[in-house]
Regions:
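Short terminal or interdomain "cap/linker" segment that borders an active site or interface and mediates
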Residues: 95-170
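Active-site helix-to-loop segments that bind/position phosphate- or nucleotide-bearing substrates
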Residues: 1-65, 69
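Residue-level marker of positions within ordered structural domains that often coincide
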Residues: 48, 89, 168
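Generic structural signal of hydrophobic/aromatic residues within well-ordered alpha-helices
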Residues: 30, 51-55, 88, 113-116, ...
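Long, amphipathic alpha-helical coupling/dimerization segments that relay conformational signals between
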Residues: 58-107
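Arginine residue identity/basic-tract feature
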Residues: 1, 53-56, 89, 100, ...
Length: 172
């Protein structure tokens, strides 16, 4: 299941402000990601609550199977995101797309999941919600921003090497 919205935005000192919403995504990373973009796609994808239930059962009965199942479910949600990107290329053929920039990437706080899901009405439309730690439920879900631009986009600017936090990241 998925949902997306094409939104216009402005960039200011606070971050990226999406028009006709109250959402402002803070940080330099998202500003850099949407540099020279005309608009953005805010998207959310989830594969199923049933996956979460089955994973919990396997974690209690067979951890090896749980590990494999978890990995396969991660691949499945990423493939679902790829399909949404294909759909977007068909719907907006005159635009180049940036890569998927997930909520929580770079210096964009994970707490932005809450306003992001509200803008999409994701809870009601695809059953995607948050826990108190801003983790998505169902777990095998993705939220992301894709920029749309008339100019070709480099896909090289991905990963730790280009992240604003690459010198101070606790995960490196």
């Amino acid at each position: 299941r998925f949902i997306y919205k094409k939104l216009d935005f402005t960039v200011n000192e606070d971050g990226v402000a999406f028009k006709n919403t109250s959402m402002v995504l803070p940080g330099e990373s998202i500003k850099k990601h949407l540099y020279k973009c005309d608009s953005a796609i805010c998207m959310a994808v989830t594969i199923s609550e049933g996956i979460d239930r089955q994973l919990r059962v396997l974690q209690l009965t067979d951890m090896a199977k749980a590990l494999v199942f978890d990995s396969l479910a991660s691949v499945a949600v990423e493939q679902a995101c790829d399909k949404v990107e294909e759909l977007l290329r068909e719907e907006y053929p005159d635009y180049y797309q940036t890569f998927r920039f997930g909520i929580g990437y770079g210096d964009l706080p994970i707490s932005m999941q809450e306003p992001f899901l509200k803008v999409l009405d994701a809870g009601k439309k695809i059953g995607l919600n948050l826990n108190k730690s801003y983790m998505l439920a169902p777990v095998k879900s993705v939220t992301a921003v894709i920029g749309l631009t008339k100019e070709p986009v480099s896909t090289k600017n991905r990963g730790c090497a280009t992240c604003n936090l690459n010198k101070t990241c606790a995960y490196r």
